[in-house]
Amino acid sequence: ADATFLSMGIPAGLFHRERPEVGIHLNIAIGLMMSRNLCEITGLTLTGYLASRFLQLESGNNSDALNQTKIILRDAEIFCQKIETRFRETAPNLWDTTPKSEHGMLEETIKNLREQWDIGFNDLLSWVCKNASERHKIKITSPAQGYVLTLLPLCLIIVLRKYHGFDSTLTNVLNMGKEADKTGILVGTWAGAIYGWHGIPESWRSGLVNGREIRIRGEGLFSNSFPKKAKDIYEMELGLTLKEFEVGKKYSKKATTFARPTPRPILSWEDEDANKSNIPEKS
């Protein structure tokens, strides 16, 4: 179960946070456009729900952090059940062809994560690899590998295990490498929901190519309305491409010119015909 599409569930999850059933319906439809794998679609939909769920989390209340974490993980288990119920109604034929061993796979993983939560940090990461290896039936050696049952638990651990602040939380997961682009999106979204706009360092918020567009889209998700003044996505991509080109020019290597050496003149005793043989060719 690949984790490539997990972040696609975030917009619908945030936009319909007051109507989670609608969010489930939309995200299952989005998931079915990208995959036929039950775990991938469940993960995509759960990712969107968790983004909206973290908005309700009180980041300053560290004394109650463990209790809040257990509640969130329990809510995630229940939400996985709702996703699979709706999936069964939406795509009954696909549900019937999905092996029974894959039913409830993500729900059971979240449940086991909740039960294992109090063990050491490194032991918990090792458990993530072991659990994913057994369920995906492939050898997994790093929790940052690109599978649903590795990246989702890993990002939950990074975000909820300790309240370090937005910058430290995001830096921690990016430093783990592997699928850093995917974990960065998940942790960045969830940590952003917890710490809010002002929890992001000013130096990170300033200088973004599409900073204004990102902000007004975030405001649009919060207000459940698409901003009319937002640029088309093509314009945003074009602006980013031009910025990358301008930055790249500063660090591009200058072309080096190669000058051919001046050929040495033939000296007086170096007759060009000196090496020609007077022996006649064999006829």
Language model: regions and residue ranges:
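Glycine-rich, charge-dense phosphate/pyrophosphate-binding loop(s)
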Residues: 143-205
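Phosphate-rich cofactor/ligand-interacting catalytic cores and adjacent structured alpha/beta frameworks
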Residues: 1-163, 171, 208-283
